[in-house]
Amino acid sequence: MAIYKIDIPYKFPSFNQYVNECRKNKYAGGNMKKKIQEDIMYFINKLQQFKTPISIKFTWIEGNKRRDLDNICYAKKFILDSMVKAGKLKDDNRNYVIGFKDTFEYGKETKVILEIKEEN
């Protein structure tokens, strides 16, 4: 059972920001998601392709406590979709991603740390 760790030094928009973008017009939310996925793929391209189910621990590191936790961790959807788009996962359904855990810390650099564990 291998564990892979990757840092994504990226400040994701809050869920509220994403919803507001989606309300602007029918293309704005999709364009925002596409841009975020392209940014994420830069960091996840060094990952291998996972052929067995995985679980992921997300450690969300923020510079302060201003944003609600649920407004931060919704971004896992962008990360998982990016992993599928980059060919690292066949799909992000329950057959391939069997669980995840969110933890939150505060530091100088806003980022998310993924700990991906292959399950057998």
Segment roles from a protein language model:
Residues 1-120:
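Catalytic phosphate/metal-binding cores of nucleic-acid and nucleotide-processing enzymes, i.e., regions
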